[in-house]
């Protein structure tokens, strides 16, 4: 049995003909080669493809499509060559079906949860040009020219140029082209990810979709930049330059200076106006963020008498949208600049019943309960990794009547919800929200109540 399984297992570089059965969390197709699972990038259910194996492990392999031999009946022509929109080959209704099913499957299979209501998915308001923030990378094209775009699928060292990003607005695309034209005129070089030299690394463009404001941040290695000519070439409401010394590719950290304009971008959401610093987290789909937070408010069932803890509060978006319906809101966030923005946003909007603190939730939760009292409702909006078991225990110790969990990853929501259910909570409702059309990413909001 062992020798048969070993013989069936492909090796790196092998080419396989595969039929795709389903889509995995994360968006890759799932196929089987003599019973051995292969995750295939660039394929959808029903496709028969030729794929090359990039990684082979004992239980599964990862491969990428090199040719679609027989397309699925579901497959449609892509709107554009865009590595950031891998699901554009599926009709939008089919995307919604798959995402909703994946949320339910994760909760049932990973969390072993049952008895909850999986509510209809909230579709996106716009299938294209919905992002308010894009992060591009600089690279060198095949002819030696400077390019600005996205990483090629599965490649950390190759950047594909982007003439028109269909996830960004026309104005955002124009700004990218202005920066690229300036950089080419200056004769600047891109960061070489193999040799680890070169100047230009990333370009981050953020747009206030409801205010019209534009924020641009150029990320480079340490070195000289003609900032005066950059200011002349790029017209926006806030222009920043970040010098990054880390060898790994990241737009976070480094030394950031404001070259022109205002230090924060303004955006309107749920009747409030938010000030957003260059590195602050803000949902990248403004319209759907408003709907997501509306779902959170609905599930929180606030009547104006509750104390709400907003954990992983960021710049205060969720907490401040709930404040008008609660007695008080207390937010906690480990990133200090985000907390400063949250405090400023509360003042800016004259919200008097919201307080925000900087701290590690694992360490701060007990002191917060001792000082402020037990919360009636806890709202959590953690990163993709979800909550640690210790953070879940701290929330359970506080004994809120309701927990509203805003999740960007159902595979980490599932074990967190299972831990809460084991402690006596009931998972009542889960509603998926499609924030990111044309991609495999899915958000959802879950309600857990104390028995």
Each predicted region: which residue ranges?
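Terminal RNA-binding accessory module
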Residues: 1-81, 93-94, 153, 309, ...
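Internal alpha/beta scaffold segment
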Residues: 157-201, 220-245
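Short, solvent-exposed loop/turn elements at beta->coil junctions and helix N-caps
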Residues: 119-126, 193, 202, 206, ...
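Short, aliphatic-rich beta-strand segments
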Residues: 205, 211-221, 273-277, 377
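Short beta-strand micro-motifs enriched in acidic
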Residues: 43, 52-56, 137-141, 206-210, ...
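Residue-level signal for inorganic ion chemistry
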Residues: 31, 46, 85, 203, ...
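Extended interfacial segments that mediate partner engagement and assembly in macromolecular machines
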Residues: 66-77, 81-190, 210
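Rossmann-like S-adenosyl-L-methionine
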Residues: 2-14, 225-451
């Amino acid at each position: 049995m062992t020798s048969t399984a070993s013989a069936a297992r492909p090796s790196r570089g092998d080419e396989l003909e595969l039929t795709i059965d389903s889509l995995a969390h994360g968006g890759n197709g799932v196929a089987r080669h003599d019973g051995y699972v292969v995750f295939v990038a660039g394929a959808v259910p029903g496709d028969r493809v030729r794929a090359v194996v990039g990684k082979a492990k004992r239980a599964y392999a990862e491969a990428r499509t090199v040719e679609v031999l027989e397309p699925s009946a579901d497959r449609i022509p892509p709107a554009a060559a865009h590595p950031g929109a891998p699901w554009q080959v599926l009709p939008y209704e089919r995307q919604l079906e798959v995402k909703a099913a994946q949320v339910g499957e994760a909760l049932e299979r990973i969390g072993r949860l049952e008895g909850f209501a999986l509510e209809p998915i909230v579709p996106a308001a716009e299938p294209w040009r919905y992002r308010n923030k894009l992060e591009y990378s600089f690279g060198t094209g095949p002819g030696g020219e400077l390019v600005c775009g996205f990483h090629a699928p599965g490649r950390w060292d190759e950047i594909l140029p982007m003439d028109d990003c269909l996830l960004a607005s026309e104005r955002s695309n124009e700004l990218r082209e202005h920066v690229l034209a300036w950089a080419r005129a200056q004769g600047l070089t891109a960061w070489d990810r193999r040799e680890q030299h070169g100047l230009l690394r990333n370009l981050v463009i953020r747009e206030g979709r409801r205010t019209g404001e534009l924020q641009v941040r150029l990320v480079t290695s340490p070195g000289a930049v003609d900032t005066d000519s950059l200011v002349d070439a790029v017209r926006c409401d806030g222009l920043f330059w970040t010098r990054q010394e880390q060898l790994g590719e990241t737009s976070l950290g480094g030394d950031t200076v404001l070259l022109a304009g205002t230090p924060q971008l303004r955006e309107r959401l749920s009747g409030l106006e938010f000030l957003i610093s260059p590195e602050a987290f803000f949902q990248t789909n403004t319209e759907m963020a408003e709907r997501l937070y509306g779902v959170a408010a609905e599930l929180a069932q606030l009547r104006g008498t509750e104390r709400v803890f907003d954990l992983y509060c960021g710049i205060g978006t969720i907490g401040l949208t709930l404040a008008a319906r609660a007695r008080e809101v207390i937010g906690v966030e480990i990133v200090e600049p985000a907390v400063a923005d949250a405090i400023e946003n509360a003042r800016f909007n004259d919200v008097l019943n919201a307080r925000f603190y900087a701290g590690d939730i694992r360490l701060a939760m007990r002191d917060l309960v001792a000082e402020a009292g037990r919360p009636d409702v806890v709202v959590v909006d953690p990163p993709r990794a979800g909550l640690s078991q210790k953070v879940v225990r701290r929330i359970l110790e506080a004994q809120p009547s309701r927990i509203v969990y805003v999740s960007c990853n159902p595979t980490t929501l599932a074990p967190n919800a299972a831990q809460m259910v084991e402690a006596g909570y009931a998972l009542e409702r889960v509603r998926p929200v499609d924030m990111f059309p044309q991609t495999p990413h899915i958000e959802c909001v879950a309600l857990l109540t104390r028995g």
